[in-house]
Amino acid sequence: MLANFKRPFFQYVKKAHKPLKLAIEDEVEVVCARPEIGELKVGDLAGIRVQKFRFNRHEYLIAYRPPAKDAPLEFLIIDFYQVGVHENFYDALKKYLRNEKQTGETP
């Protein structure tokens, strides 16, 4: 399964230290292998799943949208939206999704 990294995800990983980058990479591989593993969100974040993992005594979250179940095999792409600690995570994610929708990009 292919991974598509959105700007907030890419920027966070770019600024992270190498051990955290490796931990994030491991979690991305887990999610790509089993996209249904994360917790499904409802309401404003409907369709988004969040995978939690611990690193260095902190809990990190990865927000992603798995492909549709009826998607053709060549379109099995997981969109990774954001990664970070819990503080303001959901507020920032909602803001990004709202701005993405207003600019006309496909979520």
Model-identified regions with their sequence ranges:
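Arg/Lys-rich, positively charged N-terminal/basic patches that mediate binding to nucleic acids
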Residues: 1-27, 107
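Secondary-structure transition/capping residues
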Residues: 20, 35-39, 104
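Secondary-structure boundary motif
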Residues: 15-18, 33, 69
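Residue-level detector of beta-strand structural context in well-folded domains
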Residues: 1, 49-51, 62
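Enriched for short, Lys/Arg-rich terminal
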Residues: 55-61, 65-107
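A short, surface-exposed loop/turn module that caps and links secondary-structure elements
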Residues: 29-56
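Active-site micro-motifs of SAM-dependent methyltransferase domains
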Residues: 11, 30, 85-88
